[in-house]
């Protein structure tokens, strides 16, 4: 009878993990988690004995510590290494895929020798156990446990996950995001990037996905190793790091530019859902309290039904701003030509309105005619004629036109200057 379906593939990792030659393996295997010393907040331990320590999961959840982490700082005059003690059930029966990845990385990890090491622990997740092993026989060290109430790195990861979830559709359709993410993928995960390029030459999907899982594990392992030695790499091998980033980034950008951005809706939809899945992982990893992480994920997943209420609230906010915010009046000065055009238009409109009023049946025409000096001129105006006679137009031009008396008085009279 074969192994139970669901997690049988985890058994493939047990033989290499069981026979993996890691330094300090014999000592780590001999140590039992039960006799390790328990660490608590504000502990300060000074000792010269090589021992193991555990920080147990905190069962009492306090919401003010949503983005808090525990920092275990180990200092010593001499060199030492930290060996993580992976409990048996952590590798064989992991709680989730993230726990399994951490277990695999810790088993493959080569302990780093240093005289100062800081371990970041999530207080509400799995129990973390480690042992302090000296390089030399004469050895003393100090352990200081402190709580970082607001871990900004954790908070930024959470904010990045929320932002990525809501803008996944926009980013999946953006050529800039396509080129930049492809370049970053080529620099950080070269194996995954190369595998995506040669995908067409792999006949079976099962083979491709098996290679993809292997490339992802290898890439994560390499990135985690390099992150530990990032300062040393930057100060000692700055030229090589810059050369690698520039060369690999340039070729990655060229390959992405050659293939062009995603054009069909199926590829864009696939990228959008991958970004949303990645955003949920970031939200889960960016919160110390699992209960809050689950609530945030459920709220994000149900946010599609809140789309219309949010739009209604946004519209009401815009209307309220329109009602209570006074707009600044913009004054625009007219040119002389614009002034003449508007004056002519308004004058003609007013004269036409006056003609319509005079043509109405209830207009007192006899009373008006009895009071006019020239009734014939008024009759011509009502029938569509001009309201000015040629003599009046000529007199106006003589007084107010070019060379007229009014203009000369304005130009040459000192009192009007």
Curated annotation (Swiss-Prot):
It is a multi-pass membrane protein. The keyword Metal-binding does not apply. Keywords: Membrane, Nucleus, Signal, Transmembrane, Transmembrane helix. Its main location: nucleus. The keyword Transcription does not apply. The chain crosses the membrane at residues 148-168, 177-197, 207-227, 239-259, 280-300. GO terms for cellular component: nuclear envelope; nuclear inner membrane. InterPro entries: NEMP_fam. Pfam families: NEMP. It is found in: Nucleus inner membrane. It comes from the Eukaryota. Residues 1-24 form the signal peptide. Belongs to the NEMP family. This is Nuclear envelope integral membrane protein 2. It comes from Homo sapiens (Human).
